[in-house]
Amino acid sequence: MSIYTERAVALFREGYNCAQAVTGAFAEPFGMSQEDALRFSEGMGAGMGRLRLTCGAVSAMALLAGLKLSNGKPNDLATRKEVYAVVQEMTKAFQEKNGSIICAELLGAARPKHETAQPEARTAAYYQKRPCVGCVEDCAEIVERYLCGAGKE
């Protein structure tokens, strides 16, 4: 397990959500403070605001691809194409390993019956019944494979 993957898993186990764990692990080498990364990615956790849509860790990969590869210029379609292509490749790698990118599907039987905005308490049972740590780990490994050493410095 690489230092980035270890950092992402540690952040998740500290109580940060899946998106925060992945963005937080890569923030500084990607030119952002960890505090800012944790703040700007919080809403993506639990499948975007606990809606159980696209996995927050997968969304974090897309955010990091933009941060690493985009120049932020609206008419630069070449970098936009590059970001989209890398996001598609990373998402495909995750889906091939996990069977889905949808939070609700990844949770399966572990999905709470009554969804609210209230996050669940992080207990031993929480970590035992959910695949989230593995999803965070997979996304960190994928980000490292596709984005570290690539793109704009």
Please tell me what each predicted stretch does.
Residues Y16, M44-L63:
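Glycine/serine-rich anion-binding loops at beta->alpha junctions
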Residues E14-C18, M32, L53, P131, ...:
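Short, contiguous, pocket-lining structural segments
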Residues Y84-E153:
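C-terminal binding/interaction regions
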Residues F26-G43, P112-A117:
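Acidic-glycine-rich active-site phosphate/pyrophosphate-binding loop
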Residues F12-G15, F26, F30, M48, ...:
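Structural signal for hydrophobic packing residues in well-ordered secondary-structure cores
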Residues M1-E14:
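Polybasic, low-complexity association/targeting segments
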Residues P29-R39, A65-V86, G151:
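Phosphate-handling active-site elements
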